[in-house]
Every structure is written in structure tokens, then in C-alpha cells.
């Protein structure tokens, strides 16, 4: 292990010990907010310390076994060789685990999300595919035990959606779905195609973290135009007889958001404001990223909505993620929410890219 990486890990272990002492301080115990904050940091560092202690123990075992290789007894040397091989294997595994601990965590990973699916090129077929994508994400959310709610929807003329926006809440939602932003392409024979020709259409997906009051961009009410309208029923579970649906226009940016999920106008307004803040924050993030031209793009993609990230080929039963070169002949399973193999591959690629940067920065 490189000395620079070892030093970073040692500092993390020292911080863990320091926090342990602070958590025993009566002044800290008497401050619930401070105690909770330190407890969370202590819990995050605990796996690092455990793996580092195990690494130290295995390093001692390796040194001991290497010393025994010079023993005059052939039987002892044979045992030492066996022990050395096993210890070196465990040491290598622990080194990998420790390096993964150094990968910076995304502060948004534990947040809920706004999922936006929009039909692109392809007309009616694109709208139908938008409906298929929404169903895929809903099924995946069910498997994860997450909660989903559709905030607004514009249905396609022949089914599906021209645009649909949902809120997904639960554990690690953003962490699992954050790489889904981008252009999704579908290749299949439409039901109305009499010649059996394959059509290509596309949808864009945007994954926006739902922000808390501290992280969200402050929205000046003077910059908003709020309109009310009667829910069409497409986005919610009912058809309103009152104008409870909300449309908010952010005048400086021109962004427009809607919510027609709730019967209460106030609840719809609160959800629409939260969605607007998420979009404004994402807009600012994208602007900053484009300005940092020297910043390396992740192998798994920049999250640009125009970037084609995945192709779903129905005649071949194939789904291909172009960012990591992964092809699965499990299209039906994926469309039913079996996305873990895709999502795991994207997460692993992201970690590998981050580890490569850590190694490079460590000289």
C-alpha cells in the first residue's frame, strides 16, 4: 500500500478515536444535535477502523511467515509458505476494501429523488416507451421497498406519457438511481407497424435529488407566478372538482413545474416548490460542471440528459449500457424492475474511476 494512502487511513482512524472521546464528554452528550452529528461520523468511520486493524494484523502475519521461510526445518518452511500465500491474499482483499473507503461519498446519496421521464424522438412510440420506463422504475422501487408517487403527468395520445414526474422516497434512492439520467433509446416493432419494421425512438430521464431546506436554493416568492388549474386525473389518483392543481413559473429562469397529486392546493404547492428547487440546483450544478473544463468526466457519464446512455432492443431481448459496455440479454427481466445487474455495474465503474484518481493523486 502506498504511504500516502496509508497516511490518509491512519488519519481517519485517529479521527475515529478522537470522536470516541468526544462522545463520552458530558457537554457533547448534553447537546443532542452535536451528539447525533458526531455519532453519524463515528459510525461512518467504524468500518474503516475495523478493516485497518485487520490489515495491520495480516501484515504482521505476512512478516512472521516470511521470517519462518528461513527456518531450518523443511516442514516448518512448507507451513510458512502456505500461511504466507493465504495472508497475502487476505491482505490484498483488505487493501482493496480500504481504498474503497477513500472514495468520496456523494452527499446526496441518501436523499429521495424526483424522477422525470420525457418522450423524445419517435412520436407515439416514444410516449409508450416513456410509460414502459416509468413502470420499470416503479417495479424496481417496489423491490427496494421504496415509496413512489406521481406528481404530474401528460399522457400520450395513444397511451404512455409525453412527460411524467414522480417522487421516489426511501433508503439510498439517489445512490442507486443517480446514473439513470440521460437519453434512453428503444428499438422495437410498434403494434401499429404492419410491415414488421423496427422503429427507433428515445426518451430522456432526469434524476434530481430532493433537497432539504439547508441545501436547497432559496426561491424568492416575488420571482414566482403561481397558477391553479383543475387536475386532469392523469397524474393523481382522482379527478378534482376544484382548482387544486398548481403550476409554478420561475420567472428569472423560465422553469415551469406542476403538481396535481394532492387534493390540497397547499400540499401541491409545497411539492411543486420542492421540485423547482431541485431543478434550479441541478441547473446550477450543470453550469458549474461545464465551467470546470479541466474536470475529468466520469466513465459512467456526466449525467447530461442529451447523452445516450442505454439501448433497449426488443427483437433481440437485449439491453446495452453504452457507458460501461455492458450488454445483457435479459430485457424482459430488466423491464420488470430487475435492474440490479445494470446498477451494480455502473456503481462499480464509478468506484473504479474514483480509485484510479486516488492512486494517481497519491503519486
Swiss-Prot record:
<dbReference type="InterPro" id="IPR004373">
    <property type="entry name" value="RF-1"/>
</dbReference>
<protein>
    <recommendedName>
        <fullName>Peptide chain release factor 1</fullName>
    </recommendedName>
</protein>
<dbReference type="InterPro" id="IPR045853">
    <property type="entry name" value="Pep_chain_release_fac_I_sf"/>
</dbReference>
<dbReference type="InterPro" id="IPR000352">
    <property type="entry name" value="Pep_chain_release_fac_I"/>
</dbReference>
<feature type="region of interest" description="Disordered">
    <location>
        <begin position="284"/>
        <end position="306"/>
    </location>
</feature>
<keyword id="KW-0648">Protein biosynthesis</keyword>
<dbReference type="GO" id="GO:0005737">
    <property type="term" value="C:cytoplasm"/>
</dbReference>
<dbReference type="InterPro" id="IPR050057">
    <property type="entry name" value="Prokaryotic/Mito_RF"/>
</dbReference>
<feature type="compositionally biased region" description="Basic and acidic residues">
    <location>
        <begin position="284"/>
        <end position="297"/>
    </location>
</feature>
<dbReference type="GO" id="GO:0016149">
    <property type="term" value="F:translation release factor activity, codon specific"/>
</dbReference>
<dbReference type="InterPro" id="IPR005139">
    <property type="entry name" value="PCRF"/>
</dbReference>
<comment type="function">
    <text>Peptide chain release factor 1 directs the termination of translation in response to the peptide chain termination codons UAG and UAA.</text>
</comment>
<keyword id="KW-0963">Cytoplasm</keyword>
<feature type="modified residue" description="N5-methylglutamine">
    <location>
        <position position="237"/>
    </location>
</feature>
<dbReference type="Pfam" id="PF03462">
    <property type="entry name" value="PCRF"/>
</dbReference>
<dbReference type="Pfam" id="PF00472">
    <property type="entry name" value="RF-1"/>
</dbReference>
<keyword id="KW-0488">Methylation</keyword>
<comment type="similarity">
    <text>Belongs to the prokaryotic/mitochondrial release factor family.</text>
</comment>
Amino acid at each position: 500500500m502506498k504511504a500516502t494512502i496509508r497516511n490518509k487511513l491512519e488519519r481517519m482512524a485517529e479521527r475515529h478515536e478522537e470522536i470516541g472521546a468526544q462522545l463520552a464528554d458530558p457537554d457533547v452528550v448534553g447537546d443532542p444535535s452535536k451528539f447525533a452529528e458526531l455519532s453519524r461520523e463515528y459510525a461512518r468511520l467504524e468500518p474503516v477502523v475495523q478493516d485497518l486493524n485487520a490489515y495491520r494484523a495480516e501484515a504482521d502475519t505476512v512478516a512472521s511467515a516470511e521470517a519462518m521461510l528461513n527456518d531450518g526445518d523443511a516442514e516448518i518452511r512448507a507451513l510458512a509458505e502456505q500461511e504466507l500465500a493465504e495472508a497475502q491474499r487476505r491482505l490484498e482483499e483488505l487493501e482493496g476494501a480500504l481504498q474503497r473507503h477513500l472514495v468520496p461519498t456523494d452527499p446526496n446519496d441518501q436523499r429521495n429523488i424526483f424522477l422525470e421521464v420525457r418522450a423524445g424522438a419517435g412520436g407515439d412510440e416514444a410516449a409508450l416507451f416513456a410509460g414502459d420506463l416509468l413502470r420499470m422504475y416503479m417495479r424496481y422501487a417496489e423491490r427496494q421497498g421504496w415509496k413512489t408517487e406521481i406528481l404530474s403527468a401528460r399522457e400520450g395520445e395513444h397511451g404512455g406519457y409525453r412527460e411524467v414526474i414522480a417522487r421516489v422516497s426511501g433508503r439510498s434512492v439517489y445512490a442507486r438511481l443517480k446514473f439513470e439520467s440521460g437519453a434512453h433509446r428503444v428499438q422495437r416493432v410498434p403494434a401499429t407497424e404492419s410491415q414488421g419494421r423496427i422503429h427507433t425512438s428515445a426518451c430522456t430521464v432526469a434524476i434530481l435529488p430532493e433537497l432539504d431546506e439547508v441545501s436547497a436554493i432559496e426561491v424568492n416568492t416575488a420571482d414566482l407566478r403561481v397558477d391553479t388549474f383543475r387536475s386532469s386525473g392523469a397524474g393523481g389518483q382522482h379527478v378534482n372538482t376544484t382548482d387544486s392543481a398548481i403550476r409554478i413559473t420561475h420567472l428569472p429562469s423560465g422553469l415551469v413545474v406542476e403538481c396535481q397529486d394532492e387534493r390540497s392546493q397547499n400540499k401541491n404547492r409545497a411539492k411543486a416548490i420542492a421540485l423547482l428547487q431541485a431543478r434550479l440546483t441541478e441547473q446550477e450544478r450543470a453550469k458549474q460542471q461545464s465551467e470546470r473544463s479541466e474536470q475529468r468526466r466520469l466513465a459512467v457519464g456526466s449525467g447530461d440528459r442529451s447523452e445516450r446512455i442505454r439501448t433497449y432492443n426488443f427483437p433481440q431481448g437485449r439491453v446495452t449500457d453504452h457507458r460501461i459496455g455492458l450488454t445483457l440479454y435479459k430485457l424482459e427481466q430488466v423491464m420488470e424492475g430487475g435492474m440490479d445487474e445494470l446498477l451494480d455495474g455502473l456503481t462499480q465503474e464509478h468506484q473504479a474511476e474514483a480509485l484510479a484518481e486516488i492512486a494517481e493523486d497519491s503519486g
